[in-house]
């Protein structure tokens, strides 16, 4: 019962914060006054003046798309070079060398696409300058890019017989200055108050409370008896040769809180530490865990209400929100039950306690004892529903069904809230597909929000909906055919295949989380995963802007008795059905070879 209350609390807090934020974002989109305008509008106007931006410019969809691509391309080149040259640049207190070209390519592609896939550990690979000037900046602008494209699509629904969708540069400026900076400033201060580190100190070394012994391979020796004076390690009276006694701990420092905040709110997901928000210095307690977890879905959920207010049809925004929310709740319930019940092998003979949600119960492998099953499962559902990818537990250690649900949430196209901006414009593409199919069934010309849906919009909508499945399946298919990829798997068989499929699902969905048993830092994998991320990010953006441009040029059709309602429960059901059918048809064969095969091998 305590677990149920905990899950309900998380969801209730999310909704309570999303509604007012959605109203605020709508005002920012339209350039209306907000309670922060007196402070922030002068900053906004200063940016326009310095950058010589015409705030009244109206770009057509092609110019808007070119602006997005040029801006992202410049960010890619800058971040790529910053990593290569970090060894000779300042802000490198640990003296770290430049990053290899293939890893630099992968990381640059990852962060400009809002994926934040990390084939490295940040605290031991990247300097403070690279983290702050490279990654954190991209965390802001990649998130803003997704929201800007959504703004353009919303204007496509609003405008009548128009060509312009607004200015990309104005949208980016307003989003960063009025939304992302204020929100993340507040969250950063809360995280610092909760114990997340924020400094520019060099890494420190501290003494352990008691020494530990490790083997020559670096593995901890269990039941070891340590004699510090003689430097001898024994187990059951026998001396362990080549054993090393460890008495000190390396503690990374740095500006973590500021990066963690935008990592969460921008659905970026790339952690300051290698183990992300499972690290006690990045997420030390329940208070910081709650803030970070709610932050994942805060903007994606708020944008649903922004959409409803902007198109002057609040019920439409609520309908889209409910479709996402129902899918999220079902996924959360599935993960929570799977992790609490563990596997038949763990549950047999009372091997683990599965009767409560206390920290020792259920499948606790890969989870932090300070969070337990409930907080870990909720985070797993939130981070894969959004295109975040941040973690507070290791998804590779989840049960087969629990891991499959996290994978499926990404494979659906990251439209169950999804990334900031991109999740909603992806779901709206599914909504267009839904009204078209429904129109065919009843013999009516499909229309959505007063705009007629014709073959042009359908072609682009299908492309937006299928970009993620194509990227994932083609990429993982190529990788599966390369023998050397199998050497990078910590496991064989069904779980090994799941590790590889999860990696490509994560990159294809611009998520960034991973089954940690997959070593992705090779030249081949860095390049192919980078290409998958770029394809899955920018093809839907181009498709969305093409749809927006077409819709803006159409006249508005009056609602009639034959118009399909897109705000009732039936439409919500149809929308969910279309999303699930496309996901199931696309990925069921692959899931059958991975997590489903692993599940049935455990129960039989």
Explain the meaning of each model-derived region:
Residues 9-22, 71-84, 148-155, 185-194, ...:
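Hydrophobic core segments of alpha-helical transmembrane domains in multi-pass membrane transport
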Residues 90-134, 198-294, 348-422, 486-535, ...:
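P-loop potassium selectivity filter motif centered on the GYG triad
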Residues 287-318, 325, 387-459, 535-536:
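Long hydrophobic segments that form regular secondary structure
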Residues 429-433, 438-442, 459-485, 489, ...:
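C-terminal catalytic subdomain
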Residues 164, 305-311, 440-455, 486, ...:
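Alpha-helical transmembrane segments
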Residues 126-200, 287-318:
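A conserved hydrophobic secondary-structure block that centers on an alpha-helix together
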Residues 7, 56-74, 167-185, 311-328, ...:
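Alpha-helical transmembrane segments and their helix-start/interface "positive-inside/aromatic belt" motifs
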Residues 1-106, 150-151, 158-162, 166, ...:
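N-terminal alpha-helical transmembrane segments of multi-pass membrane transport
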């Amino acid at each position: 019962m305590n677990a149920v209350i905990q899950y309900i609390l998380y969801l209730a807090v999310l909704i309570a914060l999303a509604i007012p934020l959605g109203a605020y974002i709508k005002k920012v989109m339209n350039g209306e006054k907000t309670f922060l305008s007196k402070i922030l509008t002068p900053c906004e106007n200063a940016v326009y003046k310095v950058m010589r931006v015409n705030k009244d410019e109206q770009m057509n969809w092609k110019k808007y798309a070119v602006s997005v691509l040029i801006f992202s391309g410049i960010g890619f080149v800058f971040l790529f070079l910053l990593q290569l040259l970090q060894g000779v640049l300042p802000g490198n207190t640990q003296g770290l060398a430049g990053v290899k070209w293939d890893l630099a390519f992968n990381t640059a592609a990852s962060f400009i696409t809002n994926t934040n896939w990390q084939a490295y550990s940040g605290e031991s690979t990247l300097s403070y300058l690279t983290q702050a000037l490279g990654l954190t900046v991209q965390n802001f602008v990649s998130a803003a890019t997704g929201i800007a494209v959504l703004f353009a699509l919303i204007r496509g629904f609003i405008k009548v017989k128009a060509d312009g969708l607004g200015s990309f540069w104005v949208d980016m400026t307003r989003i960063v200055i009025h939304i992302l900076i204020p929100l993340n400033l507040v969250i950063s201060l809360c995280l610092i108050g909760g114990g997340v580190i924020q400094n520019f100190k060099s890494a420190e070394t501290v003494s352990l409370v008691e020494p530990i012994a490790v083997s020559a391979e670096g593995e901890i020796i269990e039941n070891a008896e340590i004699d510090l004076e003689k430097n001898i390690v024994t187990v059951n009276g026998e001396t362990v040769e080549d054993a090393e006694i460890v008495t000190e701990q390396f503690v990374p420092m740095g500006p973590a809180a500021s990066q963690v905040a935008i990592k969460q709110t921008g659905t970026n997901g790339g952690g300051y530490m290698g183990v992300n928000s499972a690290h006690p210095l990045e997420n030390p307690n329940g208070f910081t865990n709650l803030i970070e977890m709610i932050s994942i879905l805060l903007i994606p959920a708020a944008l649903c209400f922004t959409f409803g207010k902007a198109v002057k049809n609040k019920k439409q925004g609520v309908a889209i929100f409910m479709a996402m929310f129902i899918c999220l709740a079902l996924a959360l319930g599935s993960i929570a039950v799977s992790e609490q019940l563990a596997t038949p092998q763990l549950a047999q003979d009372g091997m683990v306690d599965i009767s409560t949600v206390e920290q020792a119960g259920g499948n606790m492998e890969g989870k932090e004892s300070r969070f337990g099953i409930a907080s870990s499962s909720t985070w797993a559902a939130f981070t894969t529903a959004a295109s975040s990818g941040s973690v507070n537990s290791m998804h590779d250690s989840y049960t087969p069904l629990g891991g499959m649900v996290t994978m499926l949430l990404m494979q659906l196209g990251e439209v169950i809230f999804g990334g900031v901006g991109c999740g909603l414009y992806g779901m709206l593409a599914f909504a267009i597909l839904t009204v078209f199919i429904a129109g065919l069934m009843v013999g009516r010309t499909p229309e959505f929000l007063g705009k007629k849906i014709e073959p042009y919009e359908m072609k682009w909508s299908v492309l937006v909906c299928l970009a993620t499945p194509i990227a994932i399946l083609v990429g993982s298919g190529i990788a599966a055919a390369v023998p050397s990829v199998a050497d990078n798997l910590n496991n064989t068989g069904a779980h090994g295949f799941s590790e590889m499929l999860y990696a490509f699902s994560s990159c294809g969905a611009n998520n960034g989380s991973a089954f940690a048993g997959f070593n992705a830092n090779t030249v081949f994998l860095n390049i192919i995963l980078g290409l998958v991320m770029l394809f899955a990010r920018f093809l839907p953006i181009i498709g969305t802007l093409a749809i927006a441009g077409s819709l803006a040029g159409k006249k508005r059709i009056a609602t009639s008795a034959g118009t399909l309602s897109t705000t009732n429960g039936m439409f919500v059901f149809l929308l969910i059905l279309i999303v699930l059918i496309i996901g199931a048809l696309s990925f069921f064969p692959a899931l059958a070879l991975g997590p489903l095969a692993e599940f049935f091998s455990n129960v039989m």
